[in-house]
Curated annotation (Swiss-Prot):
It is found in: Cell inner membrane. The gene is arnF. Translocates 4-amino-4-deoxy-L-arabinose-phosphoundecaprenol (alpha-L-Ara4N-phosphoundecaprenol) from the cytoplasmic to the periplasmic side of the inner membrane. It comes from the Bacteria. GO terms for molecular function: carbohydrate derivative transmembrane transporter activity. This is Probable 4-amino-4-deoxy-L-arabinose-phosphoundecaprenol flippase subunit ArnF. The keyword tRNA processing does not apply. Heterodimer of ArnE and ArnF. Coiled coil: none annotated. Keywords: Cell inner membrane, Cell membrane, Lipid A biosynthesis, Lipid biosynthesis, Lipid metabolism, Lipopolysaccharide biosynthesis, Membrane, Transmembrane, Transmembrane helix, Transport. Residues 26-47, 99 are periplasmic. It is a multi-pass membrane protein. Residues 1-4, 69-77, 121-130 are cytoplasmic. The lineage of its organism: Bacteria, Pseudomonadati, Pseudomonadota, Gammaproteobacteria, Enterobacterales.
Amino acid sequence: MRGYAWGAASVLLVTLAQLLMKWGMAQIPLMSFADVTLNLFMQYWLPLVVVSGGIFGYALSMLCWFFALHHLPLNRAYPLLSVSYALVYLAAVILPWFNESATLLKTLGTLFILFGVWLINSQAKVKTPQ
């Protein structure tokens, strides 16, 4: 059970990281490398901090993932990562600042992903290393 808890923490952190980076990058205009100046950092400090928080979230997620892999067989652990796709989709539809639309096709695809994860992890119990 400990492996699933670490896996869930990894999934939640990677979902948060993805949302933070999307929001932060949407606030910064597209530019070339030559446009990067100190003034740019001063003007867009908040989005840059948010993107940095997203990168830190990815690092924490990876740490949790290492612990999940320690406790779960790979064929059980790896599908858990797919849950983050569903969570990102759901959050992007619900949270107003992402302005994502829900469509039948996207929702069905997300449900298929979740069904696949459930199917793989609901099979007969196998002993997991402690």
